[in-house]
């Protein structure tokens, strides 16, 4: 299986399956001399891990990360950092009934068409359980970006179903189970989730991630544009079906006079572009949004076929999220951090000596 690595200078390679013994990753390109402990990674893992809310899957995994290599006496050595998280709460018997059945809306059918077999236990490699290692690797990037460049990366839920959420108060995001920045909408989200659990159904969501303090100049035209790499990283997250940078698809209804971000001596007067122009960061906030589909792991009966081509009725068993968008927030933050870390190292490698007199804000 190819496609398990992201990045060029800051490279993250993950391995493991949902019901395997463990998940792991190798992180290459981490500069030496960075203070790093398992506790530095655990905070974001705790934000992502299952079983922490009545609105997410009740699979209870502690997700305790172990640093296996690349750190000596609490400091990175510049060599490959190996990370491992053991799986402790697998219930593979929940999936025995789908050994020969393809769950509609899942990767069962396509994995078997591609490889001729599949690990049917919780989706195997296609499960969102894999993203735990992305979050661990992303936490390394977030720490480096914050300490060396003052870059802050934050994410939040900005829509669930037909309930739009305004970014009113970032401090509220960690104070509720929805990563919601709009305290006036938490009750409505709660009611929607209770209704979905009662119906055995699910709902889609929109997640927004913002990076502040990113310097101008990151991005490698033409094929490794910063926005292209961000879109690639976010689209690689399970259930993501669309990505927008800045105003995204809303620009369709705008005129050029409205959409352009005018510049004065005081700086940019707007940020419709989401902090990226010509594939290169402008120094403004980088803003990206991603749309996540409603999970197909629901108890509402649906039609499908088995591997023998026979039509059968499917009712999903097991422990699942009514809205996968909730736990996607720390994953989106991690993927944005990984991309920015990679591009900062690439910029430093090629253009460290470049100096300009152009104003920066």
UniProtKB/Swiss-Prot annotation:
Pathway: Metabolic intermediate biosynthesis; chorismate biosynthesis; chorismate from D-erythrose 4-phosphate and phosphoenolpyruvate: step 7/7
InterPro entries, sorted: Chorismate_synth, Chorismate_synth_AroC_sf, Chorismate_synthase_CS
Name listed for the protein in its UniProt record: Chorismate synthase
Cofactor-binding details, from the entry: Reduced FMN (FMNH(2)).
Encoding gene per record: aroC
Obligatory cofactor(s): FMNH2
EC number: 4.2.3.5
Binding site for FMN: 125-127, 238-239, 278, 293-297, 319
A Gene Ontology BP annotation from the UniProt entry: aromatic amino acid family biosynthetic process
GO molecular function: chorismate synthase activity; FMN binding
Keyword field contains NADP: yes
Taxonomy, superkingdom: Bacteria
Cellular component, GO annotation: cytosol
Family to which this protein belongs: Belongs to the chorismate synthase family.
Subunit (UniProt): Homotetramer.
Annotated residues for binding of NADP(+): 48, 54
Reaction it catalyzes: 5-O-(1-carboxyvinyl)-3-phosphoshikimate = chorismate + phosphate
Pfam families on file: Chorismate_synt
Top EC class, one word: lyase
Keywords carried by this UniProt record: Amino-acid biosynthesis, Aromatic amino acid biosynthesis, FAD, Flavoprotein, FMN, Lyase, NADP
Functional description taken from the UniProt entry: This reaction introduces a second double bond into the aromatic ring system.
């Amino acid at each position: 299986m190819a496609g398990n690595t992201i990045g060029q200078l800051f490279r993250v390679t993950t391995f493991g399956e949902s019901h395997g013994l463990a998940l792991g990753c190798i992180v290459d390109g981490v500069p030496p001399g960075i203070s790093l402990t398992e506790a530095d990674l655990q905070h974001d893992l705790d934000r992502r891990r299952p079983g922490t809310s009545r609105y997410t899957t009740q699979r209870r995994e502690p997700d305790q990360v172990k640093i296996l290599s690349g750190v000596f006496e609490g400091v990175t050595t510049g060599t490959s950092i190996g990370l491992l998280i053991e799986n402790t709460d697998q219930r593979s018997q929940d999936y025995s009934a789908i050994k020969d059945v393809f769950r509609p809306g899942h990767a069962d059918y396509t994995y078997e068409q591609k490889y001729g077999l599949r690990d049917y236990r919780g989706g195997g490699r296609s499960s969102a359980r894999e993203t735990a290692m992305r979050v661990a690797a992303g936490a390394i990037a977030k720490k480096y970006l914050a300490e060396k460049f003052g870059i802050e990366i934050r994410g939040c839920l900005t829509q669930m179903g037909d309930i739009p959420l305004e970014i009113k108060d970032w401090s509220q995001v960690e104070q509720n189970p929805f990563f919601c920045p709009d305290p006036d909408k938490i009750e409505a989200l709660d009611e929607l989730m209770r209704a979905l659990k009662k119906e055995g159904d699910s709902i889609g969501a929109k997640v927004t991630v913002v990076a502040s303090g990113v310097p101008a100049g990151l991005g490698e035209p033409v094929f490794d544009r910063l926005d292209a790499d961000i879109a690639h990283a976010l689209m690689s997250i399970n259930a993501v079906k669309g990505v927008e940078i800045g105003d995204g698809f809303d620009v369709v209804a705008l005129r050029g006079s409205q959409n352009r971000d005018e510049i004065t001596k005081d700086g940019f007067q707007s940020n419709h572009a989401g902090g990226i122009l010509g594939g290169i960061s402008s120094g403004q906030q980088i803003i990206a949004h991603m749309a996540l589909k409603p999970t197909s792991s629901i108890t509402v009966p649906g039609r499908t076929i088995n591997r023998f081509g026979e039509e059968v009725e499917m009712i999903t068993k097991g422990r699942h999220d009514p809205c996968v968008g909730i736990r996607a927030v720390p994953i989106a933050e991690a993927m944005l951090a990984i991309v920015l870390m990679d591009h900062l190292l690439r910029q430093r490698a090629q253009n460290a000596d470049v100096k300009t007199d152009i104003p920066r804000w």
